[in-house]
């Protein structure tokens, strides 16, 4: 396979399986549309090699699914390195066992939770049915006895006993409930009851006959106080009122335009008596049963309890009439459970003393005049009583059918994902292009996106303790991250010895910008570079195209900002310090670099020196605040030294492969990682066996007799920890040696 070519391999991905090895990322999806520059860690400048494809595949799975393409020149030439990479990326058997056990525990926990939810729902329904049976025996008896008791004659209906004719408070309340349960009964003319009505009632059975005196008594009671009314056709539901048990407000279904509508002049005493009498006729609308026991008649739509309570409260507020008994009855009814069961288009609700189950297409709205409340006169100014909100205990009787089962917080799995993020960050930082949070979530975090703060904090802790570098978020809006080597002054900018020419040029550009008031026009910058023998139209043997390097590469890497000068004609551009430059270096370092080249004291530039000191103090305050916040976050997440305990996959790599070689093979993946990182990692390995030298390593000094950090803040960090890094510092100080 030729370099720069790639092959797409797509495999299925199962989120519930949580198997990292089965999640392969297609190279075409990762590389397409970014001109190979968005993935700055892979390949040379502007080229994607075959080994980059293998690295992409490795970080797509990082588990048992890691494979290297067969019959490739790189593997034939470096069989030992290929075998070493396979051993490095192969996951520890103990870790695989832990992941398998955690996955099995997660599946078992989800199954147990769903089973418990189903059992709780079944128990709640059984308790609910038992409460209905115990508290409403009269309704059950009336519902069942309407078809089984013998028929009575018309003469028996008016000759009822005084106990039957005189309605008790409980009977009248049940009658009012029956009015509310069957509000859709057609309105009668305001005429007294005739013998034909009595005969019709006698034909229906004694239960209907007994309802007539109760209806008469209820109409007399309604003459002294207003009846609870439903919302009209053009009235909107008041969502400010307390909701029912389920916590949801169900809107009323749309009313069809009735052909026969009652007059809108407002309910009179006679019309109220007619409505009460029609409630007795509502008993005749109970569905008849056939041989199969199925209901033939359609049941009418029943308003939910929260709608009833809200309508009653709103009606009382409009009429300003005290209604203590009706409010108590309504609040007692609203306290009963109301459950919306899952299904296609079916609702099952508990309303008063009957259960209704109907589809939306079978619901019929009540025939209530829309202007009833508007025509009701104001009689008194008593303060209305608002129905109380049901308690949380009643609300929790019916559990939700959909139980959200989140994956458990497994510290071992989170630390493994953090270790993968460390490798991903170090390799992708190869070209110094800021790393996006979206790329980390897509390539490494994946299904653990809910634990992203903890994973990235664990990765930051590992980077600090093992490699001596920090993960910085330089842009809070776009969420861009960079790696900063805080202990090594020569590795802060660009970070590699092969980039020494770029490092020197960048320091010169930053110095020109700083000495010209923190902004330099393009003409001023090129004039300074011409004095050094650098011209924009001439290709440099080490730097290549200078204009592209300064206006594109350094801008992409966030070392510089290239902006258009406002209100300039013809258009002019200027350079400023970028976000990465502000984090990787400081104004004091740049000023000391310029003074070292000219053999002068930085204090001779008094204004710039004071500005650099002020910038150093501000940076120190920001770093201290971030360190304090980071310490608190790690204490809450229990992140400590245990994050460094365990097998690290790079420990098995041969030592010679971890050493940077300027003339070495650039196909080696480990040579792509900045040399200063590996120097820090080797120093961590050495000091881990010598606890007395751990403080020296953290101070940034690993060789010589300078065992303590510099006493002066202006002196900056100490010297490099290796000979190659010291040579890079010397070369950057005397940059004229390679320019000429």
UniProtKB/Swiss-Prot annotation:
Would you kindly state one Gene Ontology biological process term found in this protein's UniProt entry? negative regulation of transcription by RNA polymerase II
Q: Which InterPro entries does the UniProt entry name for this protein?
A: MAGE (IPR037445), MAGE_WH1 (IPR041898), MAGE_WH2 (IPR041899), MHD_dom (IPR002190)
Stretches assigned to the MAGE domain: 414-612
Q: What top-level branch of life does the organism fall under?
A: Eukaryota
Instruction: Report keywords, A-Z.
Output: Tumor antigen, Ubl conjugation pathway
Q: What job does the chain carry out?
A: May enhance ubiquitin ligase activity of RING-type zinc finger-containing E3 ubiquitin-protein ligases. Proposed to act through recruitment and/or stabilization of the Ubl-conjugating enzyme (E2) at the E3:substrate complex.
Describe its partners and assembly state.
Answer: Interacts with TRIM27.
Q: What name appears for this protein in its UniProt entry? A: Melanoma-associated antigen D4
Q: Which organism is it from?
A: Bos taurus
Encoding gene (name): MAGED4
């Amino acid at each position: 396979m030729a370099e720069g070519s790639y092959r797409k391999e797509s495999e299925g991905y199962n989120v519930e399986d949580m198997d990292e090895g089965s999640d392969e990322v297609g190279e075409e999806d990762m590389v397409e549309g970014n001109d190979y520059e968005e993935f700055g860690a892979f390949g040379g400048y502007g080229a994607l090699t075959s080994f980059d494809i293998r690295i992409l595949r490795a970080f797509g799975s990082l588990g048992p699914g890691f494979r290297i393409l067969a019959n490739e020149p790189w593997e034939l030439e470096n069989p030992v390195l290929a075998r070493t990479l396979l051993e490095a990326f192969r996951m520890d058997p103990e870790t695989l066992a832990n992941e398998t056990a955690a996955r099995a525990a997660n599946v078992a926990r989800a199954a147990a939770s769903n089973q418990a939810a189903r059992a709780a729902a079944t128990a709640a329904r059984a308790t609910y049915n038992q409460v209905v049976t115990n508290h409403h025996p009269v309704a059950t008896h009336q519902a069942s006895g309407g078809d089984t008791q013998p028929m009575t004659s018309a003469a028996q209906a008016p000759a009822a006993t005084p106990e039957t004719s005189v309605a008790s408070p409980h009977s009248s309340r049940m009658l009012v409930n029956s009015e509310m349960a069957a509000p859709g009964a057609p309105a009668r003319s305001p005429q007294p009851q005739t013998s034909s009505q009595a005969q019709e009632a006698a034909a229906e059975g004694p239960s209907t006959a007994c309802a007539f005196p109760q209806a008469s008594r209820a109409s007399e009671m309604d003459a002294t106080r207003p009846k609870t009314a439903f919302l009209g056709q053009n009235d909107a539901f008041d969502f400010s009122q307390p909701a029912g048990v389920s916590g949801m407000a169900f809107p009323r279904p749309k009313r069809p335009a009735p052909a026969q509508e009652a007059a809108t002049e407002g309910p009179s005493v006679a019309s109220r008596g007619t409505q009460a009498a029609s409630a007795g006729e509502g008993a005749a609308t109970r569905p008849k049963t056939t041989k199969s026991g199925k209901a033939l008649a359609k049941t009418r739509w029943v308003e939910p309890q929260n709608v009833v309570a809200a309508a009653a409260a709103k009606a009382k507020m409009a009429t300003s009439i005290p209604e203590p008994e009706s409010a108590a009855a309504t609040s007692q009814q609203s306290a009963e459970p109301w459950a919306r069961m899952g299904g296609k288009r079916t609702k099952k609700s508990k309303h008063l003393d009957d259960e209704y189950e109907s589809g939306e297409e079978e619901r019929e709205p009540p025939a209530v005049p829309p202007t009833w409340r508007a025509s009701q006169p104001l009689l008194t100014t008593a303060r209305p009583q608002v129905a109380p909100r049901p308690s949380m205990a009643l609300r929790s009787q019916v559990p939700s059918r959909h139980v959200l089962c989140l994956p458990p917080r497994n510290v071992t799995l989170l630390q493994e994902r953090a270790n993968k993020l460390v490798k991903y960050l170090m390799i992708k930082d190869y070209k110094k292009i800021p790393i996006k949070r979206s790329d980390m979530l897509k390539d490494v975090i994946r299904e653990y996106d809910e634990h992203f703060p903890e994973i990235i904090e664990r990765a930051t802790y590992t980077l600090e303790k093992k490699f001596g570098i920090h993960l910085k978020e330089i842009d809070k809006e776009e969420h861009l991250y960079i790696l900063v080597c805080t202990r090594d002054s020569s590795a802060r900018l660009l970070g590699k010895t092969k980039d020494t020419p770029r490092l020197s040029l960048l320091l010169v550009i930053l110095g020109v910008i700083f000495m010209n008031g923190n902004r330099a026009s393009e003409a001023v910058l090129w004039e300074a570079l011409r004095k050094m023998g650098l011209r924009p139209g001439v290709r440099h043997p080490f730097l290549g195209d200078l204009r592209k390097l300064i206006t594109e590469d350094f801008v992409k890497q966030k070392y510089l900002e290239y902006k258009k000068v406002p209100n300039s004609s013809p258009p002019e551009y200027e350079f400023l310090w970028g976000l990465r430059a502000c984090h990787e270096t400081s104004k004091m370092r740049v000023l000391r670099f310029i003074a070292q080249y000219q053999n002068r004291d930085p204090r001779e530039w008094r204004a710039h020196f004071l500005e650099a000191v002020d910038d150093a103090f501000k940076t120190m305050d920001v770093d201290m605040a971030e360190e304090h916040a980071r310490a608190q976050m790690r204490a809450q997440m229990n992140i400590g030294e245990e994050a460094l305990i365990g097998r690290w996959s790079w420990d098995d790599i041969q030592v010679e492969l971890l050493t940077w070689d300027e003339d070495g093979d650039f196909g080696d993946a480990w040579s792509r990682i900045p040399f200063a990182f590996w120097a820090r990692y080797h120093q961590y390995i050495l000091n881990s066996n010598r606890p007395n030298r751990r403080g020296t390593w953290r101070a940034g000094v690993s060789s010589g007799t300078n065992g303590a950090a510099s006493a002066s803040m202006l002196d900056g960090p100490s010297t490099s920890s290796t000979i190659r890094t010291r040579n890079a510092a010397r070369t950057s100080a005397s940059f004229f040696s390679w320019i000429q």
